[in-house]
C-alpha cells in the first residue's frame, strides 16, 4: 500500500537521509505511532517540508500531518504532490539502479518527495505515457506518440535549463547535444573531480566534443561559477554582446 510510505521520502541535496514505514490510517494507535516516528525524523534531519502523495488515503494522511505539525509547534509545512507515474517509476529498471536497497513503496516515496524539490528532474525519469495526460493519447500509433511526447519533454527541459551540478543522467540526456553516454560521463566526471565551476570546464568531459558543447552549453547552468552568465540561458558565444549590454 503506497499510503504506508507517504511523506517519508525526505531528501536533501538529492540524497536520501532516512526511511521508515508507518500506517497512519490503520487506527488511532497506529496514527499516534506514525506521528511519533515522523516527528523524531523531522527533528533529527531538520525537515522543513513534507510531500504527501495525492493517491490512496491522501486526505487522512494530510489530517495526520496537520496534527503532527501542531504538536511540533509549527516550523514545518506540507504540500499535496501529484504522484502520477510514481508507481511505474518505482518498479522500473532505473529506480532499481538508483535505489537497489529499497522496496517499491520507499522508491515511490522518494520520487514523490523529489517532485516537490525539482518536479522536472524527477518526471523525466518516467515514460510520458504513464503520466496519463490526455485520455485519447493511446489512440495514436505508439511510435508517433513516443516521438511527440519525447519532443515535448526535451523542449521543456531545454526551456527551463539544467543545473549541471545536481542533474541526473536521466535529465542530462534530454538536453540538446547530449546523449546517454555523454550524460553519464558528465555525472562520472562530476563525482570524480567535484562540481563544475564554469561552463568551460564542461569541455573536459570525455567524449563531449566541441559540437556537442556548442549545442548544449546554453541549456546547462553552473550556479557555482564566478561568471554570472554561466547560470543563465545566454550562450557562451554571446557573452561579449551580453557584457556590453
Q: PLM features: residue spans?
A:
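Structured core elements
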Residues: 9-10, 16-18, 49-53, 77-80, ...
Amino acid at each position: 500500500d503506497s499510503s504506508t510510505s507517504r511523506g517519508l521520502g525526505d531528501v536533501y541535496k538529492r540524497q536520501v537521509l532516512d526511511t521508515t514505514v508507518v500506517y497512519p490510517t490503520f487506527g488511532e494507535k497506529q496514527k499516534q505511532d506514525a506521528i511519533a516516528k515522523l516527528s523524531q525524523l523531522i527533528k533529527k534531519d531538520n525537515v522543513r517540508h513534507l510531500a504527501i502523495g495525492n493517491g490512496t488515503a491522501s486526505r487522512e494522511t494530510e489530517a495526520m500531518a496537520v496534527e503532527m505539525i501542531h504538536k511540533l509547534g509549527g516550523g514545518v509545512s506540507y504540500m499535496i504532490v501529484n504522484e502520477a507515474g510514481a508507481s511505474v517509476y518505482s518498479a522500473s529498471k532505473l529506480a532499481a539502479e538508483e535505489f537497489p536497497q529499497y522496496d517499491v513503496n520507499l522508491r515511490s516515496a522518494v520520487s514523490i518527495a523529489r517532485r516537490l524539490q525539482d518536479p522536472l528532474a524527477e518526471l523525466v525519469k518516467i515514460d510520458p505515457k504513464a503520466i496519463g495526460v490526455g485520455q485519447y493519447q493511446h489512440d495514436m500509433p505508439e511510435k508517433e506518440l513516443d516521438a511527440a511526447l519525447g519532443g515535448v519533454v526535451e523542449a521543456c527541459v531545454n526551456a527551463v535549463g539544467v543545473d549541471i551540478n545536481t542533474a541526473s543522467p536521466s535529465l542530462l540526456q534530454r538536453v540538446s547535444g547530449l546523449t546517454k553516454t555523454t550524460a553519464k560521463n558528465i555525472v562520472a566526471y562530476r563525482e570524480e573531480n567535484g562540481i563544475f565551476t564554469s561552463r568551460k570546464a564542461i569541455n573536459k568531459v570525455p567524449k563531449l566534443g566541441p559540437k556537442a558543447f556548442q549545442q548544449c552549453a546554453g541549456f546547462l547552468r553552473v550556479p557555482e561559477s564566478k561568471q554570472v552568465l554561466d547560470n543563465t540561458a545566454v550562450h557562451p558565444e554571446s557573452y561579449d554582446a551580453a557584457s556590453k549590454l
